[in-house]
Amino acid sequence: MVPSVHIIGCGLIGTSIALSLRKSGYKVSAEDINADHVAQARDLGVLATLSEPQFGETSGQRAEVVFICVPPGVAAETINVAFGKFDGALILDVSSVRRSIIDELDRELTDSGRVMGAHPMAGREVSGPSSARADLFQDRIWVLTQGSEASRVTAAMVITDMGGALVTMEPADHDRAVALVSHVPQLVSSALAAQLIDAAQSDLAISGSGLGDTIRIAGSDPNLWSDILQGNATEISRVLRQVSNELAELSTALEDKNRVRIEQTLRAGNEGRARIPGKHGSGTNRFESVNVMISDQPGALAELFAGVGVLDINLEDVRIEHVMGRPSGIVQLFVPIGESEELESGLYQRGFDTRGRQ
């Protein structure tokens, strides 16, 4: 029998959890202090209520699992109150920082075994319940910290029912890891995007997918991310100093026309990128791609995907780049090595405007 679930915080993550678990047959309720968030969550079919001054009072049920989906700056306070309001419930905090929150919790909570960190390594560059998706956590890692063995079993069941994969870490190890793989990338993306504010429009007009890929996450919520970054300041500062030193040395190498040092950085980047796990946890995936020009109109992309489906070739990834000044776009279809020629030939024979392989 699945446990009843209550969610405190109806933002992107909280509402996505509600949608996912409801789809899996869970009884789910939610609350938020933001009336707009409550209304948007309700529009999506979530049983959401406006929080009273002491949140938890309006839940209308005795939840067995409570997700804390609030900004890190108020997570500890929310956990402390929820711990008393939902007697015996497993409390899962989705915050992307751990140590700073643990330090603020009452000792009774940290010793109880029923308060856990459950950080989903998933999200979007847009926020709010209107951006929520039931499949947001499909095949995404959730990092579990703390908790008793019984709590871990329950957490694992709920998370796997959302399609998630589990990794267990100590809180300090979690904070060190996310500083490198999540928090600093956000800052680097934002810092680069900030350079575009005073750029000439004619310069921006020639930008391509490289810039777009690099600054995609710069569209994230500044208020939420300020909370996150302050909560993991020590680890983030350490990584930022390393990146800053690398950039300073690279700048000097460029001024000195030191080709060896420049190549050293580029090759180190290749090596680091290759260490990122690929599909199913294997080494970095290497794909071939086929470029296809399609018109910018309803149904064009669906028609292309249908054409690929007829060929019985598995797409590993898709990227779309709009063509400036034309109502069309280039779709880059990524497939396993050795299958791009068959894909290009098959699509061409079916009348698609193929534009070469890579």
Q: Predicted segment positions?
A:
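NAD(P)+-binding Rossmann beta1-loop-alpha1 motif at the extreme N-terminus of oxidoreductases
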Residues: 1-53, 57-60, 65
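Hydrophobic anchor at the start of a short beta-strand
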Residues: 5, 28, 166, 315, ...
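Helix N-cap at the beta1-alpha1 junction of Rossmann-like dinucleotide-binding domains, i.e.
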Residues: 35-36, 96, 149
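Rossmann-like NAD(P)-binding element
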Residues: 54-92
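Rossmann-like NAD(P)(H) cofactor-binding subdomain of soluble oxidoreductases
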Residues: 78-130
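Internal alpha-helical scaffold of NAD(P)-dependent oxidoreductase catalytic cores
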Residues: 136-219
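Interdomain hinge/lid region at the active-site interface
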Residues: 200-270, 289-290, 297
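A conserved regulatory-domain signal marking ACT and ACT-like small-molecule sensing domains
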Residues: 272-358
